[in-house]
Amino acid sequence: MSTVNVQIGLHELLNGSNAQIQLSVPQLVEKVLMRDEGKLTSTGAVSASTGKYTGRSPKDKFIVKEASVADKIAWGAVNQPISEEHFNKLYTKVLEYLKEKEELFVFKGFAGADRNYRLPIQVINEYAWHNLFVHQLFIRPTEEELTTHESEFTIVSAPNFKADPAVDGTNSEAFIMVSFEKRIVLIGGTEYAGEMKKSIFSIMNFLLPEQDILSMHCSANVGEEGDVALFFGLSGTGKTTLSADPNRKLIGDDEHGWSDNGVFNIEGGCYAKCVNLSHEKEPQIFDAITFGSVLENVIINDQTRIADYNDTTLTENTRAAYPMHAIDNIVLPSVAGHPNTIIFLTADASGVLPPISKLSKEQAMYHFLSGYTSKLAGTERGVTSPQATFSTCFGSPFLPLDASRYAEMLGEKIEKHDAKVFLVNTGWTGGEYGVGKRMNLGYTRAMIQAALNGELAKTETAKHDIFGLEVPLHVPGVPDEVLMPEQTWADKAAYKAKAIELANEFKANFKKFDSVSEDIINLGGPIA
């Protein structure tokens, strides 16, 4: 199937009598309720459930193996190839399926808040609530922008269309396929709305580096003086909590680009976890869930329509989607200058990493590639004790290119803009999980504050004898003994043994990076 035929098929779909294009939020909310796709909550949000798929399906995600990208993609378990033939046949079937639907919903918008680098996109949805979701998550065009909008990538989403693995070359009924040549994302068999968000992120992770822009899985905020901070960290490290600072404005909570102009948000909204959400703990998120917001897999009281954020009957991965303007303390448009400070967050359950360390450029690249944290019991089926987990660049499921490409770009930008990088351990202190205790949140906030305001630039440090990290000896508001992890352990020999064990896990994980420079390994990793 040629690109021309793809465009003809899309044109027919978009011009069909069933296509509802660029409906407003109230119109979409009406459609969701009339079509019985979801319920209205007491705060005016729409609540919908996603059936058996309550999270992403990494084993069902494919990139079409096309001549123009075949030698650029890092093929493997994350970027699984599928043939053009399989894609073309499935694409044709999905389009025929959607043409028969009574209604389709179309959103046109952008990914990328920097107008120089934004990607015009369109999303064709079988579900009205999915269209409401993308309306809130991506960047909405002005009326003037809409008149000249020409989509460069299209998501075609048909959750009720089930693939046949024997015929379609998939691993299950669900599929998420990206064709870079045809500029199409094809999604079916899963109702989980996050697949649309993350598909566009994966695409930006391919397109932006081609323009010398580093794409990043991180949150970002800016201080009153215009100083920018990035927060990288896997689930459970405190990224959302620590980047929500009343004295700093949020640029974005999840996906960013770093160009020669500075940092920009890729999205126009937030997709926040809301398990155990409360106004006391996270008022920004709690207050953002108003009319037009989307709740995913959150249990709602049948009579009062009040959301119960503590109920994990459907999943622990309950989510809320809302536009950036639903939060008070933000920068709009979501662009800012070059980062002054970069924070890597890790929740080390072995209790051996320092609560804060200063990183050299090589150490920053090493820890960026490592993307370490601990997977805790309860976060994944089968995990009963904490396990070391490594997610390359803090976002391996979304990286189509070789990881070293992103790391090299990070190193170049750190050097060029003199960004200060810190590794912050929000995990355990005084012993490993089960013996020690979780790091005091007040101490972590004080350490991050000291990093942001430049106090750690002049403080005395000591080199950690196993990890080679520069550990500050004094941080305002934090007891000195907390800063050196060994001092918090009663059994010093047990500390050393556990630290060497983790250092060896870092080294074993790093063996997969065969294309990185020796400097990163020799100057960036553990020294014992």
Swiss-Prot record:
InterPro entries: PEP_carboxykinase_ATP, PEP_carboxykinase_C, PEP_carboxykinase_N, PEPCK_ATP_CS. One of its GO terms (cellular component) is cytosol. Its EC number is 4.1.1.49. One of its GO terms (molecular function) is ATP binding. Binds 1 Mn(2+) ion per subunit. Mn(2+) binds at K198, H217, D254. It catalyses: oxaloacetate + ATP = phosphoenolpyruvate + ADP + CO2. It is found in: Cytoplasm. ATP binds at K198, H217, G233, L234, S235, G236, T237, G238, K239, T240, T241, E282, R319, T444. Its main location: cytoplasm. Substrate binds at R56, Y192, K198, R319. Its cofactor is Mn(2+). CDD domains: PEPCK_ATP (cd00484). Keywords: ATP-binding, Cytoplasm, Decarboxylase, Gluconeogenesis, Lyase, Manganese, Metal-binding, Nucleotide-binding. Pathway: Carbohydrate biosynthesis; gluconeogenesis. PROSITE patterns: PEPCK_ATP. Pfam families: PEPCK_ATP. It comes from the Bacteria. HAMAP family: PEPCK_ATP (MF_00453). Involved in the gluconeogenesis. Catalyzes the conversion of oxaloacetate (OAA) to phosphoenolpyruvate (PEP) through direct phosphoryl transfer between the nucleoside triphosphate and OAA. This is Phosphoenolpyruvate carboxykinase (ATP). The gene is pckA.
